[in-house]
Amino acid sequence: MRHSGREAVPQKLVWNIKEVLFVKHFISRRNFLKAAGVTAAASAMAAAVPQASAGFLTGKDAAVTILYTNDVHTYIDNKSPKLTYAAIAAMKQGYVDEGKPVLLVDAGDHIQGTAYGSMDDGATIIELMNEAGYDIATLGNHEFDYGMARAKAIIKEADFPYVSCNWVDLRTGLRVLPAVKLFPAGGKWIAFVGITTPESFTKSTPAYFMNAKQTKYIYDILGGDDGRKLYDAVQKAIDKAKTLGADIIIGLGHLGVDPSSSPWTSEEVIANTTGFDAFIDGHSHTVMENKQVYDAAGKAVTLTQTGSYLANVGKMTIAEDGAITTELVSTADVSDAAVAATAEAWINDVDAMLGEQIATTDINFYINDPATGKRRIRMGETNLGDFVADGIYTYFNEVEQLDCDIAMMNGGGIRTDVDAGKWTFKTCKQVSPFGNVACLMSVTGKQIQ
């Protein structure tokens, strides 16, 4: 937004603003490879990927390991010491090879966040998760970012089931997905209850939950102003898991612990229900190895979350007596070659499509506090937020000649820091991956006030 006292935006950054602000590509990895004449090679590579997803069925060890991720946001190009899907695949396969029961689960927000997700609407990310051997996942709010039809298509493309106890079709009154899924492991039945944040309405696009004419909502993510609709849906799912014979019940939720998400946080859900033994969370990007939260009956429930962007992978161990421990793993010295090849091929494709340099800058742009690394965007002013808003202002005034007085950009649509150096189209995609449309409105000063 244009205002006095804002942080300075460097004048050395020069580009064609019209090209940058409205660049958008829709091309699938498969179509790109087909155009390049290498479809056969890609198919052969995919066929060579070892299938380890049934390892939990053969494991005889009484202790059960659950590997978990959340808010990966398509960060597939992580370098050491950060993790990758190839590392996770190898970690899981290690347990399978030793005959130990293991499950690999995700708590949502995996198909959106960088150009590696938006360039094919999450198709390659699902391919990587399939190859890595994921056993179950829940939907985060960003799984809806490519539209309702695409969200449903992603569920079909996945080799693993999605669960959500509170996503309902208002036309039928029925859940869109199963609420709970049970797995046999280590002589126990382990149940996962899926939960999607009701904030999906506002943190995705409300129109995606409406009919084609956008006259009424046809989908709901149950929440309730006081949280009761959410708590009731979760409790019903827990009770169903018990009826089905679950020995251990784990919440697989995309809720978070940020107070701004109240009354729909994971802590509030635990406090208003009974029956969870543990809760694997997402949404707030919180690093939380193990927090004890008391449920409505006074029982301590283990709450855990890995942070975001594959900075950590969670490891939950369920002992023979049912005791649960958790730890966060931030490095890995193993890698699955086939999964790594799939990721590298797509990274190279995207980098080639978006690699043209369009600008340079001699300063760092940030959305996170440079001193602490904690999120600052959406909570205060950042120089990248100022720059994006100034870019919109410049576009309307200097390119379209539309006499814009004020430009605003929602902080949640600015997604990454940018180091000093060259800017490419990929950089722009990483900063603003949602493909938002810039709009011009005529309002009075009183309305703004």
Language-model regions, residue ranges each:
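Non-catalytic terminal accessory segments
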Residues: 9, 13, 17-18, 22-64, ...
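Acidic, metal/ion-coordinating pockets
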Residues: 24-37, 55-333, 379, 384-394, ...
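Membrane-proximal interfacial segments on either side of biological membranes
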Residues: 332, 338-339
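N-terminal amphipathic/hydrophobic targeting modules at extreme N-termini
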Residues: 2-3, 8-10
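Polar helix-capping/helix-linker motif
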Residues: 49, 231, 336-337
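N-terminal secretory signal peptides that target proteins for export/translocation
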Residues: 1-2, 23
